[in-house]
């Protein structure tokens, strides 16, 4: 499973967006059914930013669904269809 840990980037908005964009494109093209993004638990602000980023129309076209892991709220699972 592909994974992106955002802990080292949490203070720089531009780096976070770039890392997310590159990661989603890489995961989309990899053929993996699921990829994980780890914003951590913290205050939930980073997780909200990640979900808002994933909800943008141009990003939404790349995956089927995204969800907060029900067993670990510090992790977001992004599901891709195998087209």
Outline where the language-model segments fall:
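Long, charged, low-complexity intrinsically disordered regions
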Residues: 1-83
């Amino acid at each position: 499973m592909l994974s992106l840990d955002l802990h080292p980037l949490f203070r720089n908005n531009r780096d976070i967006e770039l890392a997310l964009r590159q990661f989603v494109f890489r995961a989309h093209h990899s053929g993996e059914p699921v990829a994980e993004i780890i914003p951590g638990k913290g205050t939930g602000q980073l997780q909200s930013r990640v979900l808002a980023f994933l909800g943008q129309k141009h990003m939404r076209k790349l995956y089927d669904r995204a969800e907060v892991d029900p067993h670990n709220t510090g992790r977001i699972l992004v599901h891709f269809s195998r087209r």
